Regions:
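Entry beta-strands of beta-propeller and related beta-repeat scaffolds
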Residues: 133-134
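Unchanged
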Residues: 152-179, 184-242
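NTP-handling and nucleic-acid-processing catalytic cores
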Residues: 1-98
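Acidic, metal-coordinating catalytic segment for phosphate/diphosphate chemistry
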Residues: 101-125, 129
Length: 281
């Protein structure tokens, strides 16, 4: 537990606490008790609080909680479940500061003698609502069964890249992207099929197929992977890519707060460090 002094936009300074100090840059709002000793609740809509480090304006919400009478709570909706639910109720912003981190194993174990190249990539989770199946690809020449995934070109959004990759890898063209996860995954591995180490930021988008409209796949793509429709209940056994398994386990029905370990991001001097290492300090 870490304590801060928070300045409100009316000049009043109040004490506040943060359950996990390493999440300070993920704070997007502040909660004050209904029976607080600082402000008139009728004025809350006209007030903001100042982030103790960045100086950003934070929304203030009032909760019927006696524990908040003398000390406010800093809210981190992306990483604390109770705060995530408050964010849904009060329309608070989410800011990810811990990225789930995946490191290559087996043939994709990092090669210390090879340079690492950064890449933005996308995981596209596409559903056929008629039979509750999901569009996947199976690579016959290597052990790789996954959702559709691929790199994001410099000028593309994750949504645009997903639609392009779906067309190239499966031939399907009548697809709608319906949502993008608030989370980015980090994947550090040796891309044995490319001969380079990669550090990828993985964006996750979800969508649906509208029809069976397809275009002919190139012969090169046919050799690399085959499209398959997999039932929801069979995805756990089908998927072999660990970060895809994470998506299937946690994000299929909507985002939830990520409470686990990972690489710090959007956190200035803490960026690139493991959360678990910071918690031990």
């Amino acid at each position: 537990m870490k304590e801060f002094e928070i300045e409100l936009s009316n000049g009043i300074k109040i004490p506040a606490k943060l359950e996990y100090g390493e999440l300070i840059y993920g704070v997007t709002a502040i909660a004050i008790g209904k029976n607080n000793n600082y402000i008139n609740n009728n004025d809350v809509s006209t007030l903001t609080a100042k982030h103790p480090i960045t100086g950003d304006n934070l929304q203030i919400i009032i909760l019927d909680n006696n524990n908040l009478q003398n000390t406010a709570t800093l809210l981190v909706p992306a990483h604390i479940p109770e705060h995530f639910e408050l964010a849904k109720k009060y329309n608070l912003p989410y800011k990810q500061v811990v990225a789930p981190y995946f490191r290559g194993t087996g043939e994709q174990t990092l090669r210390p003698d090879i340079e690492t190249k950064f890449r933005r990539s996308v995981i596209a989770v596409i559903k056929n609502e008629k039979d509750n199946t999901y569009l996947c690809v199976d690579s016959p020449n290597r052990v790789c069964k996954s959702f559709v995934l691929g790199g994001i070109e410099e000028e593309e959004t994750p949504e645009e890249a997903a639609i392009r990759e779906i067309r190239e890898e499966t031939g399907y063209t009548d697809v709608t992207i319906t949502r993008k996860s608030i989370f980015i995954l980090h994947n550090h591995f040796y891309a044995d099929y490319k001969g380079v180490n990669r550090y990828s930021h993985l964006y996750i988008v979800f969508g649906k197929i509208n029809s069976d409209t397809k275009e002919e796949m190139s012969e090169e793509e046919k050799k690399k992977q085959l499209p398959k429709w997999i039932k929801r209940e069979d995805l756990e056994d089908f998927l072999t890519v660990i970060n895809n398994k994470f998506v299937n386990d946690y994000l299929m029905d909507g985002d939830i707060a990520y409470i686990g370990d990972g690489i710090m991001m959007n956190s200035e001097e803490m960026n690139g460090k493991l959360r678990s290492e910071l918690k031990e300090q």
